[in-house]
């Protein structure tokens, strides 16, 4: 374990003393540090009346137990504190460490020892080996009662809301939409979980089209074959219009007011929401239009879908109506809500957070968007090509519609609405235009970057630099496009398409607690969070701070001095093998074993580079045909320790999200020896070589220059590392699998790579 603490708010000695006293610790400024430490320890043994015995099980050095020490006349030393602190945090002497000073240095322990009250205060805010902060562990053990009132420590809400007395209710919010032309406004089902309390409380909202169920068989049947011919496109310039964000004016309902009349027992929850539920935040889960329990069509990513979620935030602020049932005869008021909302969730869920933020909806104070899509074109297309998300060849937006239109999982809904649904789905399948792979109005209507200037909320993004599902370009684009007037924060980790709130190496939960206590509970805690926090790829459990995602300097590296050719065509056996399992293709491609058609360029680095942003390939090429795909990958190649991209369990169910509530595993990315690491990649239709909206003809056997931007990353490269560039045509994981006989020739003498860095790195 190594500490990377971003959540602790520096506290003065007097403030620390008062907070400790407020928690019930019997400290006294007139007493010695030794006496105060003993009082602190005895009060911490919440489950034991025999505190002498508890003290006797701790040691203050390699030979002395704590009970003996406190009965002696020995002075308290720094070494004594180090032994005690480590044990309180769950580290075991003679197992985890023998030399506390060296161990504390190794784990980057953040606590200082100048003042006993400051020191104990900071210790309470530190995470233990199990992943829980010491204060959270003590509260769970009974330091404070679950009295359904707010209690704070170091600017963060504590788990003092009783999760055994939760209210679970369902309401149906009226939207301004009629997505299936039914003649009535669409309703969206809202599942609410909230503590029983006299306070008006803020809300953690997860907008999840998956939460009411998914239709795997329908999606599987809709999934496309990737084998086919790459189209030769007619030269043209694509034109699109950005539509203003409009909404109907709402009028107050005159219906009788009623409490919610529908309840539920269970819903798949997000554990970060659970963490905040025990700390006085309501949890709501909304699947939006076109899902089971709601009405309407699954419009998949456009602003109609976004508005169906926005309506829920408006209801929390008293602006729109929610009904007790589909009868629409009684309304429910969110009289428990303070009107302030934070949205959470990964992938599609985080995507809806981004979309909501771009509406500028009142009451949305914070989005915590993890692995979020910023424009749907970049999820299912790339540079004029159909480009499947990593791991899902053949998926497209209409396939996702089939997956998430869960109304068809309710038989009564199916027989009444399926004909209309199928007609709308067919329209969607035509609009996505798999034939050309081009950007069009349909995709433009699902591009949240067009409305990014409307964002008013505070923004937190997390993203994996090894996420080839929702690729890093999504967060790179949206983060750098956000208005300068807002506060924004970005956590970039070395994993794939995963959550990071339950990792050992970073206090993400506690950082969000400080931020949301500030923004949603109005606590003036002076919490400040860095703009870009990045997981160092060279060292285990180490996070660094940067000013920006994207460097201000470009380094240029030549690619060679010869001309090399890439064939597109494979023999039938190889083609069928790669179509059957794209992982076989990737393995052969990365090994460079002459089984795949590729140009491999090895670039031994002559100095250190902190790659920060989008690498670009500047290539001089010619093709033998009027169509061509160019694909590229950049690898850090050669044996050394690197991160795996999926976190593994450190301790099973050690993370407590309240008082023994919604426990989950503590995880971390393994750091082990490996042969290579993909840094970046990309695919390009050479007919879209100038920009996305310009389609150009290809003159066979005529040289032309292209600039090819690859996926952004932050990656530390060292002198002597081998940067491997692979150029090829068809990518069997992502692109159309056209086995036509064409070739691309690259003049390496006229080609180079630019690496974005920060000046001075």
From Swiss-Prot:
Keywords assigned: Aminopeptidase, Cytoplasm, Hydrolase, Protease, Serine protease
Q: What is this protein called?
A: Xaa-Pro dipeptidyl-peptidase
CC annotations in GO: cytoplasm
Task: List the transmembrane segments.
Answer: none
Identify the EC number(s). Answer: 3.4.14.11
Where does the record place it?
A: Cytoplasm
Q: Name one GO biological process term.
A: proteolysis
Q: How does it assemble?
A: Homodimer.
Q: Name one GO molecular function term.
A: dipeptidyl-peptidase activity
Q: Supply the enzyme class, top level.
A: hydrolase
Please name the SMART domains in this protein's record.
PepX_C, PepX_N
**What Pfam families does the record tag this protein with?**
Peptidase_S15 (PF02129), PepX_C (PF08530), PepX_N (PF09168)
Function of this protein? Removes N-terminal dipeptides sequentially from polypeptides having unsubstituted N-termini provided that the penultimate residue is proline.
Q: Which residues form the active site?
A: 347, 467, 497
* Xref: InterPro entries: AB_hydrolase_fold (IPR029058), Galactose-bd-like_sf (IPR008979), Pept_S15_Xpro (IPR008252), PepX_N_dom (IPR015251), PepX_N_dom_sf (IPR036313), Xaa-Pro-like_dom (IPR000383), Xaa-Pro_dipept_C (IPR013736), Xaa-Pro_dipeptidyl-ppase/CocE (IPR050585)
Which reactions are catalysed by this chain? Answer: Hydrolyzes Xaa-Pro-|- bonds to release unblocked, N-terminal dipeptides from substrates including Ala-Pro-|-p-nitroanilide and (sequentially) Tyr-Pro-|-Phe-Pro-|-Gly-Pro-|-Ile
Task: Identify its protein family.
Answer: Belongs to the peptidase S15 family.
Q: Which domain of life is it from?
A: Bacteria
As recorded in Swiss-Prot or TrEMBL, the protein's gene is named: pepX
């Amino acid at each position: 374990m190594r500490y990377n603490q971003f959540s602790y708010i520096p506290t003065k000695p007097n403030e620390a003393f008062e907070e400790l006293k407020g928690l019930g610790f019997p400290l006294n400024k007139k007493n010695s540090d030794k006496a105060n430490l003993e009082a602190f320890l005895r009060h911490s043994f919440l489950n034991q009346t025999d505190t002498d015995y508890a003290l006797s099980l701790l040691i203050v050095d390699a030979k002395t137990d704590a009970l003996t020490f406190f009965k002696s006349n020995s002075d308290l030393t720094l070494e004594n504190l180090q032994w005690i602190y480590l044990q309180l945090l769950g580290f075991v002497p003679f197992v985890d460490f023998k030399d506390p000073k060296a161990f504390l240095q190794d784990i980057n322990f953040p606590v200082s020892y100048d003042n006993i009250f400051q020191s104990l205060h900071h210790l309470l805010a530190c995470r233990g080996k199990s992943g829980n902060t010491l204060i959270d562990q003590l509260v769970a053990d009974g330091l404070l009662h679950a009295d359904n009132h707010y209690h704070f420590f170091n600017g963060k809400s504590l788990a003092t809301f009783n999760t055994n007395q939760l209210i679970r209710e369902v309401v149906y919010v009226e939207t301004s939409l009629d997505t299936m032309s039914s003649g009535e406004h669409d309703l969206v089902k809202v599942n609410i979980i909230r503590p029983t309390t006299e306070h008006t409380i803020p809300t953690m909202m997860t907008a999840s089209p998956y939460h009411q169920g998914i239709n795997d068989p329908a999606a599987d049947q809709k999934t496309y074959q990737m084998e086919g011919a790459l189209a030769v496109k007619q030269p043209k310039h694509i034109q699109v219009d950005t539509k203003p964000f409009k909404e109907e004016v709402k009028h107050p309902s005159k219906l009788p007011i009623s409490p919610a009349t529908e309840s539920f027992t269970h819903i798949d929850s997000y554990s970060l929401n659970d963490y905040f539920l025990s700390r006085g935040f309501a949890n709501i889960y909304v699947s939006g239009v076109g899902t089971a329990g709601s009405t309407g069509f699954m419009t998949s990513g456009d602003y109609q879908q976004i508005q169906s979620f926005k309506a829920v935030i408006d209801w929390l602020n008293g602006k729109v109506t929610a009904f007790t049932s589909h009868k629409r005869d009684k309304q429910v008021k969110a009289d428990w809500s303070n009107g302030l909302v934070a949205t959470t969730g990964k992938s599609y869920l985080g995507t809806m957070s981004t979309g909501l933020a771009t509406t500028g909806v009142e009451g949305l104070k914070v989005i915590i968007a993890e692995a979020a899509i910023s424009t749907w074109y970049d999820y299912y297309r790339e540079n004029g090509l159909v480009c499947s998300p990593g791991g899902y060849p053949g998926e497209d937006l209409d396939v996702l519609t089939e997956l998430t239109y869960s109304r068809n999982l309710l038989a009564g809904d199916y027989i009444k609405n399926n004909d209309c649904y199928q007609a709308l789905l067919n329209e969607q399948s035509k609009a996505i235009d798999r034939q050309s792979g081009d950007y069009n109005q349909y995709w433009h209507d699902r591009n949240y970057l067009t409305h990014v200037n409307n964002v008013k909320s505070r923004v937190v993004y997390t993203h994996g630099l090894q996420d080839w599902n929702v690729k890093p370009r999504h967060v790179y684009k949206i983060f750098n496009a956000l208005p300068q007037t807002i506060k924004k924060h970005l956590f970039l980790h070395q994993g794939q398409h995963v959550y990071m709130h339950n990792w050992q190496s970073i206090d993400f939960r506690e950082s969000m607690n400080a931020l949301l206590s500030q923004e949603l509970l109005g606590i003036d805690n002076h919490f400040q969070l860095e703009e870009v926090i990045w997981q160092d790829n060279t060292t285990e459990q180490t996070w660094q701070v940067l000013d920006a995602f994207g460097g201000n300097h470009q380094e240029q590296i030549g690619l060679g001095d010869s001309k090399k050719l890439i064939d597109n065509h494979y023999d039938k056996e190889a083609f069928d093998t790669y179509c059957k399992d794209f992982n076989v293709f990737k393995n052969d491609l990365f090994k460079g074993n002459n089984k795949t058609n590729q140009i491999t360029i090895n670039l031994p680095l002559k100095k250190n580079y902190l790659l920060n942003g989008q690498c670009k390939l500047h290539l001089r090429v010619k093709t033998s045909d009027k169509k061509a795909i160019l694909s590229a990958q950049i690898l850090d190649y050669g044996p050394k320790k690197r991160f795996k991209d999926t976190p593994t369990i450190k301790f099973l169910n050690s993370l407590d999200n309240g008082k023994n509530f919604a426990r989950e595993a503590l995880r971390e990315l393994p750091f082990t020896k490996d042969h290579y690491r993909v840094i970046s990649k990309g695919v390009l239709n050479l007919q879209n070589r100038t920009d996305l909206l310009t389609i150009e003809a290809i003159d066979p056997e005529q040289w032309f220059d292209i600039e090819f931007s690859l996926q952004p990353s932050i990656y530390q490269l060292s002198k002597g590392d081998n940067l491997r560039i692979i150029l090829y045509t068809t990518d069997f994981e992502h692109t159309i699998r056209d086995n036509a006989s064409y070739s691309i020739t690259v003049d390496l003498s006229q080609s180079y790579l630019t690496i974005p860095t920060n000046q001075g790195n």
